[in-house]
């Protein structure tokens, strides 16, 4: 028993020393019924927020979004920016592809007047800008579009046809080591958009891979695979695309969940259509034949009319969104300092001794 008490005192002293040297919260104790309270930003899609488990993309972490061309990668990140700006957060867009369309971004709800934008010349410059913005502590969301366009300086200064084996992978590996800690301390969300490449000579298994080496795969807390799986038509005219997002990796909740939603051309994610579908699935919206009803009131005949009703009555849409989030998302608990627990125990013992 005396040995246990000595161990407890030694541990309390060690924890106190660590926190004194490295700051409060530098070492934590995971209680049995506690989980880390991760702050998140909505993706703009309710079904994807639910699939992610935490209610959105986690702050202070690295996220990778990859998929084929025209699958909705940039659209999804612009929706994240719009959602973050609505919460009063500061966002930056590192446009390495030099292809950002400000008119389209504005249509998706992005406040382009307050969006920081950079079009770097080299990959090193892009990543240094990311690091500088992160260390400032004043930027909440940074988007890099895309990893494939982060060209090392040596490759740009060289000639076409020169061999530059592993340069991009080495550059990304160094950047990840430098950025990861800074992102956590400044609580900045860094999203990398990535492209797909094919491995040569793969006979079995998935031949697809992403650019930039393996470092990003390891450092990313969330990896999203986004694919276009169909078209949305209005008569004969194609007005959007059916999109599926798979959570390939998730360090803040259970992975491998999927979300399906529509991306409408010129409008972005069809959030009202998602509310109708999820409302029907979880019995918050009643469907009788072609008619949709909410709280006993008919809101439209057919999904298109029900969607229009929600568009015209945003207070109803907000109420339905809130109910679905409360039903489908779990709130995380508190995450306390280990040293403070021992300090509390010691204080209690001292108080008991006084009496």
From Swiss-Prot:
Claim: ATP-binding is one of the keywords in the record: yes
Spans annotated as Disordered: 336-355
InterPro entries in the record: AAA+_ATPase, DNA_recomb/repair_RecA, DNA_recomb/repair_RecA_CS, P-loop_NTPase, RecA-like_C, RecA-like_N, RecA_ATP-bd, RecA_C_sf
Main location: cytoplasm
Localization annotation: Cytoplasm
Compositional bias per record (Acidic residues), positions renumbered to this chain: 341-355
Gene Ontology terms for molecular function: ATP binding; ATP hydrolysis activity; ATP-dependent DNA damage sensor activity; damaged DNA binding; single-stranded DNA binding
Gene Ontology cellular component annotations, sorted alphabetically: cytosol
Disulfide links within the chain: none
Sorted UniProt keywords: ATP-binding, Cytoplasm, DNA damage, DNA recombination, DNA repair, DNA-binding, Nucleotide-binding, SOS response
Pfam family, one: RecA_C
Any single GO BP term: DNA repair
Keyword Oxidoreductase: no
Residues binding ATP: 67-74
Family: Belongs to the RecA family.
Alphabetized NCBIfam families for the sequence: tigrfam_recA (TIGR02012)
Function text: Can catalyze the hydrolysis of ATP in the presence of single-stranded DNA, the ATP-dependent uptake of single-stranded DNA by duplex DNA, and the ATP-dependent hybridization of homologous single-stranded DNAs. It interacts with LexA causing its activation and leading to its autocatalytic cleavage.
Protein name: Protein RecA
Organism listed in the record: Photorhabdus laumondii subsp. laumondii (strain DSM 15139 / CIP 105565 / TT01)
């Amino acid at each position: 028993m005396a040995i246990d008490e000595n161990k407890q005192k030694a541990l309390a002293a060690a924890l106190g020393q660590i926190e004194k040297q490295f700051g409060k919260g530098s070492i934590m104790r995971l209680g049995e019924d506690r989980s880390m309270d991760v702050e998140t930003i909505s993706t703009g899609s309710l079904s994807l927020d639910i699939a992610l488990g935490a209610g959105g993309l986690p702050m202070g972490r690295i996220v990778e979004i990859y998929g084929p061309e025209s699958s909705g990668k940039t659209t999804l990140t612009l929706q994240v920016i719009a959602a973050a700006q609505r919460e009063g957060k500061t966002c930056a867009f590192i446009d390495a592809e030099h292809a950002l369309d400000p008119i389209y971004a504005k249509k998706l709800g992005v406040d382009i007047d307050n969006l920081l934008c950079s079009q770097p010349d080299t990959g090193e410059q892009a990543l240094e800008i990311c690091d500088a913005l992160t260390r400032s502590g004043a930027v909440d969301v940074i988007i890099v579009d895309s990893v494939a366009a982060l060209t090392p300086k040596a490759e740009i200064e060289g000639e076409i046809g020169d061999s530059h084996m592993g340069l991009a992978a080495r550059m990304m590996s160094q950047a990840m080591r430098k950025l990861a800690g800074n992102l956590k301390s400044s609580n900045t969300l860094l999203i990398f958009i990535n492209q797909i490449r094919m491995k040569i000579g793969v006979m079995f298994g998935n031949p697809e891979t992403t650019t930039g080496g393996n470092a990003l795969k390891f450092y990313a807390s969330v990896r999203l695979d986004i694919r276009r799986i169909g078209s949305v038509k209005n008569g004969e005219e194609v007005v959007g695309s059916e999109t599926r997002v798979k959570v390939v990796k998730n360090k803040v909740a259970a992975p491998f969940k999927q979300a399906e939603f529509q991306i409408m051309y010129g409008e972005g994610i069809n959030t009202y259509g998602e509310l109708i579908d999820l409302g029907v699935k979880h019995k918050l919206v009643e469907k009788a034949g072609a008619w949709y009803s909410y709280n006993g009131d008919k809101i439209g005949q057919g999904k298109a009319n029900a969607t229009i009703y929600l568009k015209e009555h945003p207070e109803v849409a907000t109420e339905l969104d809130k109910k679905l989030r409360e039903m489908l998302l779990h709130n995380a608990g508190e995450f306390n300092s280990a040293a403070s627990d021992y300090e509390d125990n010691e204080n209690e013992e001292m108080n008991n001794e006084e009496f």
